[in-house]
Amino acid sequence: MTKEEFIKDISTGIPDCLPAPQPYDSTINHAPKRKDILTPEEKKLALRNALRYFPKKFHTILAPEFAKELQNYGRIYMYRFRPSYEMYARPIDEYPHRSEQAAAIMMMIQNNLDKAVAQHPHELITYGGNGAVFQNWAQYRLVMKYLSEMTDEQTLVMYSGHPLGLFPSHRNAPRVVVTNGMVIPNYSKPDDWERDNALGVSQYGQMTAGSYMYIGPQGIVHGTTITVLNAARKRLKEGETSIKGMLFVTSGLGGMSGAQPKAGNIAGVVSITAEINPLAAQKRYDQGWVDELHTSLDELIPAALKAVEEKRTVSMAYVGNAVDLWERLAEKEIHVDLGSDQTSLHNPWAGGYYPVGLSLEESKRMMAEEPQLFKEKVQASLRRQVAAINKLTEKGMYFFDYGNAFLLESSRAGADILKEDGRFRYPSYVQDIMGPMFFDYGFGPFRWVCSSCDSKDLETSDRIATAVLEEIRKTATPDILGQLDDNIHWIKEAGRNHLVVGSQARILYADCEGRTKIALAFNEAIRRGEISRPIVLGRDHHDVSGTDSPFRETSNIYDGSQFCADMAVQNVIGDSFRGATWVSIHNGGGVGWGEVINGGFGMVIDGTEEAERHIRQMLLWDVNNGIARRSWARNTGSMDAIRREMERTPGLCVTLPNLVDDDTINTAF
């Protein structure tokens, strides 16, 4: 397709002439068939909802076609309308646009749907089994058309993938406001998502999938590397300094979980990652994110033990069921240093977890045709997995929940995962590592994308970020030196670690001072022409302020407010009027639908004074909202961090907690 044809296709939106039906591409990793949950009348409603995107003249052709999709896949994806052009992040100037900010958003959307990036690209799923950008291809086409014609005096409103329309606003308003899965709380159970999504009225946006901010598995590699590094450091005996030769066992090679073997390599350990889907395993192998593929445990385990003995850094994938791996390790009493799990247990009944004893295809059939039996199989499998993990932890393994609802769903399955007091046997990685060491001090997954799609601009940005962090380190307080050192090492090695999949993007854990100074330096470099085109700033929702999630991001909040969502909601509101180019707020993400409220932003910076003002105003709020909340929860690191920020920032005045002696409380009752 020529550039002119691409521009015409984008600008057209839904075409006047029906495109030809497209054959089902078996080389692509497709979403499993979803649960058949709609009543006959609801199926008619789903069809009526889908057809409202199209003129009446197409209805007699599309109605039976969409009804068949609903029957075969449990959803109406509108495959016929999938574009014929290749889907990937193009340089910003290749998109038809009246607003440069809108062109940047188009680039970010296409990156989320790139087949090298997305888990189920033809079903518009970026990661996590159900993390959707849109519900169907008509929505994609309409959104791209709106973005191509909007101005900086308009805002596009997005309801769970559906473009409500362009509304008049002003230059400093967001260009796009996104909500995903915003349902009445009493109707926020997993089956409610199944029903609403099948009807075409709501979607699960995960975090960066539905907010157009995914940057491929690099986005989670850094956080996973930090987690593995610090988990491994917990295992060091007195006098030891090297973690080489430690064995890390986990599961999942999907859009997010695929980061684990790469993170293991960067950390310097031996890793084994189980993945039941051979297409997913092969994809990570082809991308160089896992070193070896094994289908036999009899071959894999001796190879891993040899690597441990040699203190060799290597990542191995077991193409098979995770429970088989865990049970064999327990049976053979293999010493495992670190254990975790990153199957998509936020979505356990619809492809997020495949039970032991069933093949991949058997599972796909059963979850669609016998959902109750499939649920029983999943829960039995979790009980077996936990039993094996418990045996290994009794022998000294450090196991942590990686925020995928493993502990939560295992407890619901009746697994031996609870202590006598009702708390989980094992910590969330946020409780033990990410919360007290990073979030409480404002460190989180800051990221940027070069809209030129030029690797030279990314290299320049890496050098700028390194110089900024090294300068900050000179006067940093001792409690954040370790965090700075790990991140300086990360950014210096980023190019050599070949982290880019999709757009020219980088992730870097930084605090408020770091994010702001790096962004201002980027803006100045764009102004001077050292970076050729605008940069998109953003972050994962999994951050200091962006997510209220009692089993993950806010699991180290102990004042009882971990089930409250004021922080995430306030955050997106505050970002929207302080300079964000787009904002989003989602139900679900990470741990699952009904368990989380999370939000994010994107900000296009272009070297202007206006961009500088937005950077200073918005990033300060985006980080310190969460630090202030964590400080009020009496988290020591946050109390120190917010005091330092108030000293630095005129106009910032945060309510601080008064600490009470235990004796005062105990003698009051």
What are these regions (language model features)?
Residues 148-151, 167-172, 181, 186-187, ...:
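Solvent-exposed alpha-helices and their adjacent loops that cap or buttress functional pockets
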Residues 270, 335, 398:
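Residue-level detector of anion-binding/catalytic polar loops
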Residues 278, 320-323, 342-347, 403-409, ...:
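Glycine-rich beta-alpha junction loops
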Residues 315-343, 350:
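Active-site/ligand-binding-proximal alpha/beta "capping" segment
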Residues 1-198, 202-213, 217, 371-521, ...:
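Long, compositionally biased, glycine/small-hydrophobic-enriched stretches that function as flexible linkers
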